[in-house]
Amino acid sequence: CKVAHTYIHRRQTTDRFSSLHRPPDPDRWLLLPCCSEEARGPPPSPAPLPARLFPGRASSPLARTPSAGAASACKPLLERLPTPSRRRRRRRATRRARSRMPRTTPWRAPRAPARAWWTRPRMARAR
């Protein structure tokens, strides 16, 4: 029931245009029908899916119990999950930052490396 609490509480506090929008109030949670022990009975069984959604697999047991099929499909993923990830290979820093760019770019000439101001050619040097 805690999950329903947090979900309803989050919807109330984040939906600005909802009629339920109000600051969080834990006392209102007691009015929810799922919170009293006698109000919520046994957990509901998963509803059987209609056969026309899966015409080919209507006779398979997975089509009638969606939760069991989802759990069995997720099990190899859950078993593989705690495998430690491999360390990322670090790419060595190259001397020129533009070395990974293509040599020629179709819409402009490749950039010449920037030169210091004292090596730039003087503008009016004509003698």
Swiss-Prot record:
What ranges does the record give for the region Disordered, renumbered to this chain? 39-127
Q: Give me the stretches of Low complexity compositional bias.
A: 102-121
Biased amino acid composition, Basic residues: 85-101
* Top-level taxon: Eukaryota
User: Membrane spanning segments where?
Assistant: none
Note in the entry: Contains several arginine residues in close proximity which may be involved in protein RNA interactions.
Q: What is this protein called?
A: Cold-regulated protein 1
Name its species.
Hordeum vulgare (Barley)
